[in-house]
Amino acid sequence: MNIAVFCSQYDVAEKYRKDAETLARLIAKGGHTLVFGGFDEGLMGVIADTAHRAGGRVVGIISERIKDSAYKLADEMVVVRDTLEMNQELIGRGDVIVVLVGGIGTLNELTDVLRMKKNGLLDGTKHIVIVNTDGFYEKFKEQLEKMNAEGFLKKEVMDAVHFADTPEAAMRYIEHNGN
């Protein structure tokens, strides 16, 4: 299974780094392919390095603008025109989407996949799993629930999103519900 992971390009607190490493090891040990944003630094570099060291297949998708910062040990690196095309390629290649902590770029990727789900542009069986390390996405979860309760977010979008407190819980969900 191709598991697309959205996460930060920046170095972050150790608790987030540990969860990224755990997720990457589980992806590799499960025989899955990691598909990620292609960057060689921050959490992106951590997940790629960890999956690679654990014997997993690593596929990067990176925009032309930052291709010089691409992860060098990827089994495959796809260079695309811009971040819009990068998001589409990441989403298209992933059988499931996993979201780790991140900033505006990660949030953009996440809301893009939710928009695609809302508009019927996403495979109906594609799951979105958000790893809620230390409650990082708790307010986002509450916002989605409020949007759903107020009629701004369709039930099928809510049903496609699963929040997991740990990478282990995320992978259990994926293994049980994945494509």
Residue ranges and their predicted role:
Residues 1-56:
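Glycine-rich beta-alpha loop segments
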Residues 38-101, 105:
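Acidic/glycine-enriched connector segments
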Residues 45-50, 109-120:
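Short Gly/Thr/Asp-enriched flexible loops that form oxyanion-binding sites at enzyme active sites
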Residues 62, 100, 116-141, 155-157:
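Short, acidic/small-residue loops that bind anionic groups at enzyme active sites
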Residues 96, 150-179:
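A charged, well-structured terminal subsegment
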